[in-house]
Amino acid sequence: MAGLLLLVILGGGWLLWRLRKKTRVLSQKLREAETTFHPLEVDPDAPLTKLLTFLDELAAPKRRTWGVALLQLFGRTRLGDKVIGERAQELSAQLRGAANVYVPNLQQSMADASRATATTDVAAFLISMVQGSVTGQLGSETSLHNPDADLVEPFLSGPENWTAEEVLSAFQPSQGSLQIDLLGNLFVDPFKLESATGGRPLLNVALKAVVDLNLESLVNKGSMGHFMSFVAAMESTYTDVPYHNRVHAADVTARLCALLHRSGIRRHAEARKDRMAIFAALVAAVVHDAGHPGTNNGYHISKRTELAHSFNDQSVLENYSLNLAFTILRQHNFTQNWSTSEFLRFRKTVIAIVLATDFSHHFDHLSKFKAKVGSSQGDAVWDAIETQDHLLLLVMAMKVADLGHCAARLEVHVKWVSRLQEEFFLQGDKEREAYLPVSALMDRHKPGPASGVNQLGFFDVMVLPLLKEWCHAFPETSELLNQAEENRRYWEKDAKEDSDRRHSQGLGKKHSVEVDSLEP
């Protein structure tokens, strides 16, 4: 009896020791999970895109996807039909429940992902970016800009009928003529460009673009001076905020020129005798962030500023930039020799391209592009799309150009991220002063855009899906995707180093923003 009791005691002690050991192991794993970096994993595909992919799988047996594999394995059996039917019902439910079939359900997808990761802030930021914010208090802040007369006057006093080459010669920077390859180089350094042009990067890029893209015929004799005074006036409306300034505008314009050329869009437009589309895209790039005050649409909507009131909370800053552009065009009218139909087409194209830079429409355009282009590449893209969809290609080119700093050379990219972070923090300071909730990634007391984990979330949800679709359709621009992936690896390394540091210090993950609270 005593021996049995001793055996029970020893056995119980051993079990208790094992339990404590397992508890320590589990506690350690929990601490590691809380401090270990996990990428933000979301489903970026819209319901319509999923449906088209499903139909392609059934219609194209050469593509050995799960649907086709099941059909080949089971034939038209009950099991094969059941699995296909269940998938069809799932897609049908997603389509019926979608507010917009072109937009993925980021609210639910990111909320689920962020609960298991250390990426709540970037999830909140991405959701707010595609949904906007509509609550806040009344404020009078606005940002109205008038062109700097001293910067515009030289172009009004020149010869009546000068050409773009003559303007280049007369107004080239003191350091010498602008030596950049706008058509072939996807990686023009905008900061060197700013220095080389004496602080007038946008004016010089726009002028060179007119020459390099062979667009002078659209700016008729007697109107070149008006065009250049228009660009000079637009450049003067860009403020000295850290990111959305004239250097950014020049950067986007230069990259767009290379994209239009390298993709073949320019060549096809010229073949259709449609240089107007290319010219409109150029002007859209020049004006797309004109007058940007360094605060985003959500800020103006939340604070109920005059700008938000003027444009009914719809694409506030994009509409403001367009309003500035067409107001200034009245004073510097390089379209005076155009027909009414030419001007209206130009105006429609510029408006569509600039409005597309509003991130709240990002997934609409991306999903439509995927649906229209499909698996087509290069010249075959033009066979895959209808004439009325050519504008979509210009819109996508502009979106790639606008997000292009993520695919810039690493040194340039990191510099842009630093500038963007400071602009975000300045907005956060304003929000705090106005007793508004500080927007995600805009609190200077927390990790901002220059945090590796936050950059990874942005790359994985916004940047890489866009570039993968674009570069698949236009492989001649695949250098952008390669560079973006290299930049992502930089941020992944940064995120892991930060995770290791936090783990060594015994820090847990911090959720500063609840995604569920972002319902509009």
What does each of the following model-derived ranges do?
Residues 1-8:
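Single-pass type I membrane protein transmembrane segment
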Residues 10-36, 42:
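Transmembrane-helix exit/juxtamembrane "anchor" motif
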Residues 38-46, 50-66, 72-84, 93-108, ...:
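Divalent metal-dependent phosphate-bond-processing catalytic cores, especially two-metal-ion Mg2+/Mn2+ enzymes
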Residues 185-194, 229-250, 306-311:
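Active-site flanking loop/helix segments enriched in acidic
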Residues 196, 200-204, 217, 221, ...:
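N-terminal charged/capping segments associated with class I S-adenosyl-L-methionine
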Residues 214-241, 261:
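Internal amphipathic alpha-helical repeat/solenoid segments
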Residues 226, 230, 251, 255, ...:
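Amphipathic, well-ordered alpha-helical segments in soluble domains
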Residues 241-260, 290:
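Active-site-adjacent "gating/activation" loops or surface patches in catalytic cores
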